[in-house]
Amino acid sequence: EDLLTIRSRLVGSGYIGGKATGMLIARNILLQDAPELWQPNLEPHDSSYLGTDAYYAFLVHNGLWPAIMRQRSPEGYLSEAPSLRKAILTGQFPAEVRSELERLLDHYGQYPILVRSSSLQEDGFGNAFAGKYDSVFLINQGAPEQRLAELENAIRQVYASSMSDDALVYRKQRGLDQREEPMALLIQRVNGRFHGRYYLPDAAGVGVSRNTFAWDSTMNPKAGMVRLVMGLGTRAVDRIEGDHACVMALDHPGRQPFRNPDEHYRFSQHLVDLLDLQEGHLETRPLSQLLDTVQDLPMAQMGEIDRAASTRAEQIGLPGPVWRLTFRPLVQFSSFIQRLSSLLSTLEAGYQHPVDVEFTLHIDEQGEPSFNLVQCRPLATIGETGPVTLPEHLPAEREIFRTQGHFMGGNISLAITRVIRVDAAIYANLNINQRYDVARRVGEVVRESSASTLLIGPGRWGTSSPELGVPVRFADIAGVSALVEV
């Protein structure tokens, strides 16, 4: 029955890829292993699939097969990629594929859709490919010809992302560079609701069944963790400069890693990602601005009124009240934590491995959440060793640095043979161009040796804002064993 359903929603033929397979397997595990909980609380998905044969047909139709063969050779693996990316972005689709895409759009009507990568190797054990391939939101409004053109552009963008430097280096680092990696696509109706000109889910998040960021010694890593945001899940998946998801350990959801109320406010969500039907694409809106124009958001479940800030706003003539996205009511007065904990533990048991999931939430009139599971994959960042025994009575002169807590990645013991450090004081005095020069130089030094390397630097590694850290790319630091952000 499942295979027949997939076939009825498949454009072309071939494989549907790892991401689509993971989503379907995870949903079936929940419905079969805990039907009494998930049949009423797991929202049905509305997914279509663009098979791997459509990817091959696109390459052949545009005369790109010889270039693909050259790119697969060791000498052409990186050098052929830029021209391939450019050619893919300007390629045309075979008539039979275009016809099936038109039927796909007829099915979705004018609901927003998300075009997601689902390559053959993606989301497999040990190969998360997190953030390496593109996903594209489409408003899906307007004339049929316009909607088809936008869908084709989105598909080209995802296809082209398979030839990005980051993706190619990631595959090579894991010994996958000489294996087939055809790109299938998972096309889904975006889960959410219309709020006037805006479309967004109530909330979205990323959950992991093992908490590798246990900032308190009383927390049980096996209880899991969640990063939760209001609106689209892009702000939960990605590290956004200057804005923060709500991070909760599922065994202590009320315990936050903040020292005072100012930190709690600073490290919270102030911006909301949503689809703007008038602008025609994904937009980011300040929460206060969104609440000025949208009155039917479930704020009573997701936030709390900041009384002091509301009083100050009233005194200077600003509209109120002032809301803070804490998600405390959702945690305290609904089944959210219990349901998410059950979801993660059930999937970990089914996979026989810790898992990483993405989901959206629909909050009903009683304040209870239902889940839409959009992705599930084996958690790729758990430690590679058992418990690590630290040496006792280590002489001070042999200790380079020491830190406790705020560590991610699980237990691991490595013999570090090289340390690269960016001096924070010097870096702070550099201009923007000089900071990009530092990032390029770091990449050059990393690639000079395959030795086990510890990289230490100020702020965030991989930031897109040089004032907040070192703007390296994944390809620059893929060979590093451990990162330290000071």
Regions found by a protein language model. Give the residues of each.
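A conserved helix-loop-beta module that forms one wall/lid of the active-site cleft
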Residues: 4-70, 74-95
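Conserved mixed alpha/beta core segments that line enzyme active sites in large multi-domain catalysts
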Residues: 1-37, 92-485
